[in-house]
Amino acid sequence: GKGSGFGLNGRSLQNQGSVTQECNQEGVVVVRIAVDKNGSVIAAEAGVKGTTNSHPCLLEPAKKTAFMHKWFSDSNAPSKQVGFVVVNFKLGE
């Protein structure tokens, strides 16, 4: 699924990845993430509030997609900044 990130006080997304699901499900999975000063995702929890399909075969690829996201580094950012990645899965992708 394709992901979009938000909630990091205006930090810009540098790179995002996409992991394909192994089943034929559709829906949105919201992943709560923690990002360090370097812009790397250091923690991810898939299936938080806003998720429309919490099928296990979507949660794992959503979490992997979130870990592939990278934000630009920010030396003024907290050591652990919380945000979200919303991954939209469509049938057949």
Please place each PLM-identified region on the residue numbering.
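Short, low-complexity, Pro/Ser/Thr/Gly-rich segments in the mature regions of secreted, periplasmic
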Residues: V86-E93
